[in-house]
Amino acid sequence: MVKTNKQDILKGILLGLVTLSVLTSVYYLNTSSTTQESEADNDYLKSEICYYALQGIKSDYHYHLQLNITIDGERIEIPTNIGFERDENGDTLFLHPIHTYDNSGRVHVETTRNATAELGFFFDIWGEEFSEENILDYNTGTEYVIEMFINNEPVDTFENTILEPYIFIDINYKIKN
């Protein structure tokens, strides 16, 4: 009779451990898939640099570049505080890893080691369009062209341009020659 009670207790403990293991596994599987689904809603959130910033971890690299946009010969002002998310009181809730502090065109990039930041990420954060056919609210159509230069050298990488320290990016929207 005593032996049966010990066996029942051992069976109960074993069954409890198996149940706990199964429930823990189900919880973690559901939690990780929910996180992946919410991140899939925004391509930028898939990038390593934004994930790093969302975790509140300091960056490994902090560098600057200059971005100049010209539309029909007129320089466009790049707004102050692109990349700052604020609450209703104006307090900063979050700072994206690619951001501005003023309207000079100086872009700050704060990344992890081995992260790749692209110019398209900056435009996504800004909430503006940029590609070979579009810049801000301007479309090339048949009469216009977008030319892009890095350090005065023509490039055709547009939104896929990799941001590097101390480069000068000039984007010109103009009538085709």
Model-based region annotation:
Residues 2-177:
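Ubiquitin-like/PB1-type beta-grasp interaction modules and other compact soluble beta-rich domains
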